Amino acid sequence: EQERLVFHVLTKSLNLPAISMWFLINPPGKATVHILSIDNFEWSSKYNIYQENNSSDPRYTSELNYLRFYLPDIFPALNKIVLLDHDVVVQQDLSELWNINMKGNVIGAVGTCQEGKIPFHRIDMFVNLSDPLIGKRFDANACTWAFGMNLFDLQRWRRHNLTAVYQNYLQM
């Protein structure tokens, strides 16, 4: 049912003309494409979308990396969304992702740890757990997940006000 597919492409205004032209030249069949510039979002001015951190690494300074935490605000009419990062290469039909039973979870994601192996991507590699307030809230050995492909239950996210929870963690 390709006509029911809607791709929301989010980008910086600098890239908007090139991406728009690419989709004009390469239309996605019967699917719809909405291309949006994050520079036009009202919500970005009311949130501190990334911490000041003296880093020039775009993984930590680009607003695009923080968008997933604001999806319920960006798409208030949507209840569920499959998020694919810019570097994901799709090799098969992803429609079954839509039918995954999330068992009450807000996020469905690909884990980065394999059973029986030493975890390579643990939470303590990404979060400073030396602060006791933060350290007691997280399991240092917990595995992280791959950010490249996620399924979000936006209704549940809104119900639990998780954007506010995320904002609180940023302030710590």
Q: Where are each of the predicted segments found?
A:
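Glycosyltransferase catalytic domains, chiefly GT-A lineage
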Residues: 1-172
